[in-house]
Amino acid sequence: SGDGSMSCATCHDPERWFQDGRAVAAGRKTLTRNTQALVDIGWSRWFGWGGAHDNLWSPSLRAITDPDEMAGSVESIAHLIRTDARYRCGVQQNFALDATAADDEALFVAIGKAIAAYLETLISGPSAFDAFRAALMDGDVTKASTYPAAAKRGLKLFVGHGRCHFCHFGAPDKRRVC
C-alpha cells in the first residue's frame, strides 16, 4: 500500500481461499463490495467486479493504486522494486528489465504481470460439484443421485434467480478439450 501498512494478503488472505470473509471489503476505506476470492480466477475471461478488465494483471494494478483500496502509486512500487534486492532481481530474471534503468511504468506493469502469473497458480482441487457435473456429462444417473438435495437446491438458486453463474462459472471441463 501507499504507506506500507497493507499487502494484497491483507484482504486476499491465503487462509480464507484468498478472500477475507467479510460482507464488504475494508481497504483504506470500507468498500462497496466484498473481496473477490482469487482461487481459480485464472479461468475467468473478464476480471474485476463488473468485468472491466480483459486480463488478470490490470485489475491487480488498479487495486494497488486505488485510493480507497491500497492507495499506492506507480512511483512507490517502482521505488520498492529498485530498493529491494529480491524484487529487483526477480524483475531482472523474469522480465529482462534492469530495474535501475527501466522507467516506473515498465516496472509497475512487470509487477502486475508477476502478480497475475502467481494468481494463475491458485487452482482448487476437485469438488463435490465437479463430481456431480462429471456424472451428469457422462450420463451416470446413479452417481449424480449422490449429490445432496440441499446442494441441488443451492445449484438451482445459483443458476436461476441468483444469477451467480454469470461471474462464478468455474473451470472448463478439461476432459472435454481436444
Predicted regions and their residues:
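Periplasmic c-type cytochrome electron-transfer domains
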Residues: 1-178
